[in-house]
Design a protein with these regions (language model features):
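Structural signature of the urease/amidohydrolase superfamily beta/alpha-barrel
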Residues: 1, 23-24, 242, 249, ...
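Histidine-rich, glycine-flanked metal-binding segment
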Residues: 1-2, 8-47
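Divalent metal-coordination and catalytic microenvironments
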Residues: 6, 43, 54, 88, ...
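Metal-associated gating/positioning segment near the N- to mid-region
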Residues: 44-111
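Short acidic/polar active-site loop segments enriched in Thr and Asp
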Residues: 90-91, 156, 247, 299
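Metal-coordinating catalytic core of metallo-dependent amide/deamination hydrolases
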Residues: 98-103, 107-232, 304
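Active-site-adjacent C-terminal substructures of enzyme catalytic domains
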Residues: 131, 226-327
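Single conserved hydrophobic/aromatic residue that forms the stacking wall/gate
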Residues: 325-335
Length: 335
């Protein structure tokens, strides 16, 4: 297959040209191509596929409406794959919640992992899927739950999360109640029923986090699985992650945490939906403000819960004057 008249984006350049491919790229040429059989892009961009490190979009296909769990799990996984690939994402780390703080999401854990595993084994997906375990450290039963799944052959990334009320992302408890409680459209209809005992048993969650963090970190280090620290809020959070051999700060919630992560040479992953919306859904640091402050504060964008936001973020960055590639002068910024 040949595509012509495309604005081709490569590692070090963008140019109008053509590309010939058959499963893999055969050749790329600059300039116009006189071939009536080629697909004419009419100057539209042709970009490499995106790599998505953290998206829980799959869960929406398993629970498309409140309390409505989709019965055909493979079909749900394929529907998610179609959305992922149509958003320009060719490699995806499906972020799967391991640990209990919403009952309905816990109930689909086994089905989600099984569907990704079977879909990969059977070659049903267009994108290349990997498992990313979001380990909820505040769950006293996390280690028992994790034991059933940590030997899956497709696990490639693990993030250490702490959603204890009053900590990290939910340091503002009112925002937590608004998100999971009566103010939530999900909960008001009975789904994503936030387990309010988490608020009543805040101390239990803190104790679980303290016990689980070193043990879970050890498990992943021994299995040579890359880890990310989730929702870092203070310098202490970032320092602790770095001491545990973690090099990724995923969705840091404050400017303080972002700057400390960069100081320790950790990679920062920020939410593309936050960037596109100009604000966080839970009142955390605005990615738009970070980018305006310094492009270098953000290493990686994640589509999180909106797959299409990843490619939209690229063009918003260009509108802000960020270079699409670093080896050219500012006059070559692509808009």
């Amino acid at each position: 297959m040949i595509i012509k008249n495309a604005n081709i984006v490569t590692l070090n350049d963008t140019f109008i040209g053509s590309i010939n491919f058959n499963e893999t790229i055969l050749n790329i040429d600059k300039g116009n191509l006189n071939n009536s059989n080629a697909i004419d892009f009419e100057g539209d961009y042709l970009l490499p596929g995106f790599i998505e490190l953290h998206t829980d979009n799959l869960e929406k296909h398993f629970i498309p409406r409140p309390n409505a769990i989709w019965p055909n799990k493979i079909a749900a996984a394929i529907a998610n794959d179609n959305e992922i690939i149509s958003s320009g994402i060719t490699t995806v780390f499906d972020a799967i919640l391991v640990g209990n703080y919403t009952k309905i999401r816990t109930s689909i854990l086994d089905d989600i992992i099984t569907s990704i595993t079977r879909g990969k084994d059977l070659g049903l997906f267009k994108a290349d899927h990997h498992l990313h375990y979001r380990c909820e450290l505040s769950d006293p039963e996390l280690l028992e739950t994790l034991e059933k799944y940590y030997d899956n052959k497709y696990i490639a990334l693990a993030s250490l999360m702490d959603h204890t009320p009053g900590q990290r992302q939910w340091r503002n408890k009112e925002k937590m109640l608004e998100f999971y409680g009566k103010g939530s459209n999900f909960t008001s209809h009975g789904a994503y029923d936030f387990d309010e005992k988490m608020l009543r048993l805040e101390e239990t969650a803190k104790e679980a986090e303290k016990k689980n963090r070193p043990k879970v970190s050890t498990i992943w280090r021994e299995k040579k699985i890359i880890m990310a620290s989730h929702d870092d809020t203070t310098e202490e959070h970032v320092n602790e992650a770095s001491k545990n051999g973690i090099y990724i700060s995923e969705f840091p919630t404050t400017l303080e945490a972002v700057k400390q992560a960069k100081k320790l040479k950790m990679k920062t992953v920020l939410g593309a939906p936050n960037f596109i919306r100009n604000k966080s859904h839970s009142d955390n640091v605005s990615v738009n403000d970070l980018v305006d402050n310094n492009f270098d504060l953000v290493d990686i964008f994640s589509s999180d819960y909106v797959p299409l936001s990843l490619i939209q973020s690229v063009f918003k960055l260009l509108d802000k004057g960020c270079l699409l590639y670093t080896s050219q002068s500012p006059r070559d910024t692509v808009r």
